[in-house]
């Protein structure tokens, strides 16, 4: 086992920061999220929807906590799940192939939330039950509204009936290294006035008073890659730093929205695909306004559309022309610095590391292959089946996630006994997980979890 010291993560992880960061590699406005630091460790020991040892029971508690996994596999929810704040959920602690949440939407409530290395692949099992009534199929695979101090890192989301992942209206948020892919387009989304199910394969609505988004991959979404929320829905201000992301195979629009907000759109890589309409292939940004809210302010620089030299030389050729001054600005909005890459470098980094990549599942591997080869399509049902396919047939879309042997952890504090002994901790003392001993500010359980990703 690896013996750790306070210098294991390198001085860059703490000496150069005035405040403790969420974990090594956390960047942007959400990097100071505390999550469940200092709270109790809760161990998920089964894949049941509810009950002792279930993910639901751990997620719905309101006390400060760190959630780890002693199992791997897919958790098939029987109802929507709400994750309460003051929590760190360490998907990378699962043995073997990791964790997936399926069948119902997951919503974030409250502040101080850290999510890492999880999969949210909802699907359409319960989406048709309401019939053609307003609100049917209005679910994101993962969503959060008005959450403060939130960071979502290396997660993989897909198969929604509204947006894949929407996060807006909060403050101090980072979305980094996530896969947002394959919303279900012609599924069971219905709103008042519709005559049929809507085509609603959208990526996400993103925004907040301060939000950083970097090294995320959008794939096979017809639009909202993302839609910037702007100062709508009660938001008084919005500042989004959108850098080093990849958008592949949009259909109608890549990025749009942003009413009366402030945006940096820098060094992103856009790759049209088989579903991209020719009229949309040369445009990566379409700002929005309403009668009450004017256009936002956009700093646009260093973005690339694959194969479009005109846009790559001059980004103003890839955005919707807006008459009048003040919409496209010459200097970036002030933000927390990120580790910067140019668009080509970001594309290569995303290929290697995006999503729940400690053990990539077959879905993410396929999406990466499709992006590289210029293939894939907008889908209506998980697995690419036709609309109306019975769930019992389409459930084969969820890959089998196999568990490896769990290491002995007799005190159930989330740290293996051998690791505790090797690092001077007591494998019979549950309380030492929450103590700061092995690092200047990470608790012992955090040091262990961070060591899994070295």
Give the residues covered by each predicted segment:
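Extracellular calcium-associated, cysteine-rich motifs in secreted modular proteins
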Residues: 392-454
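Detector for repetitive beta-architecture
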Residues: 41, 52, 64-66, 72-74, ...
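Acidic Gly/Asp/Thr-rich repetitive segments characteristic of extracellular carbohydrate-active
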Residues: 22-67, 432
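Right-handed parallel beta-helix
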Residues: 76-207
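Extracellular beta-rich repeat passengers
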Residues: 227-232, 236-391
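Bacterial Sec-dependent N-terminal signal peptides
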Residues: 1-16
């Amino acid at each position: 086992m690896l013996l750790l010291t306070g210098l294991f993560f390198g001085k860059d992880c703490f000496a150069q920061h005035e405040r403790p960061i969420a974990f090594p590699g956390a960047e942007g406005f959400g990097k100071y999220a505390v999550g469940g630091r200092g709270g109790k460790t809760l161990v998920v020991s089964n894949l049941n929807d509810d009950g002792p040892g279930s993910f639901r029971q751990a997620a719905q508690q309101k006390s400060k906590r760190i959630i780890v996994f002693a199992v791997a596999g897919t958790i098939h929810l029987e109802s929507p799940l709400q994750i309460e704040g003051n929590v760190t959920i360490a998907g990378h602690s699962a043995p073997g192939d990791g964790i997936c949440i399926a069948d119902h939407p997951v919503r974030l409530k409250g502040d101080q939330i850290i999510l890492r290395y999880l999969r949210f692949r909802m699907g359409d099992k319960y989406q048709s039950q309401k019939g053609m009534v307003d609100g049917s199929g209005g679910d994101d695979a993962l969503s959060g509204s008005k959450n403060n101090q939130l960071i979502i890192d290396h997660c993989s989301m897909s198969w929604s009936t509204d947006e894949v992942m929407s996060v807006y209206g909060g403050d101090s948020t980072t979305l980094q290294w996530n896969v947002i892919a394959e919303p279900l387009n012609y599924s069971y989304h219905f709103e008042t006035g519709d005559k049929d199910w809507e085509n609603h394969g959208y990526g996400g609505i993103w925004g907040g008073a301060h939000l950083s988004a970097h090294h995320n991959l959008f794939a096979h979404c017809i639009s909202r890659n993302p839609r910037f929320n702007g100062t709508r829905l009660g938001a008084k201000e919005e500042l989004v730093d959108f850098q080093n992301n990849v958008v592949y195979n949009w259909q109608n629009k890549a990025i749009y929205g942003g009413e009366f907000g402030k945006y940096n759109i820098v060094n992103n890589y856009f790759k049209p695909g088989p579903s991209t309409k020719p009229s949309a292939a040369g445009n990566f940004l379409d700002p929005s306004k309403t009668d009450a809210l004017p256009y936002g302010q956009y700093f646009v620089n260093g973005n690339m559309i694959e194969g479009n030299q005109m846009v790559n030389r001059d980004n103003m050729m890839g955005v919707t022309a807006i008459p009048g001054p003040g919409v496209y600005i010459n200097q970036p909005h002030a933000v927390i610095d990120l580790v910067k890459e140019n668009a080509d470098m970001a594309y290569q980094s995303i290929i290697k590391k995006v999503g729940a990549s400690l053990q990539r599942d077959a879905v993410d591997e396929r999406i990466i292959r499709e992006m590289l080869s210029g293939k894939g399509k907008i889908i209506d049902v998980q697995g690419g089946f036709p609309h109306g396919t019975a769930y019992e047939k389409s459930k084969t879309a969820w890959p089998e996630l196999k568990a490896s042997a769990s290491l002995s952890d007799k005190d159930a504090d989330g740290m293996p006994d051998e690791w505790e002994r090797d690092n001077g901790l007591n494998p019979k003392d549950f309380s030492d997980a929450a103590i700061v001993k092995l690092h200047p500010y990470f608790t012992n359980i955090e040091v262990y979890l961070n060591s899994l990703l070295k």
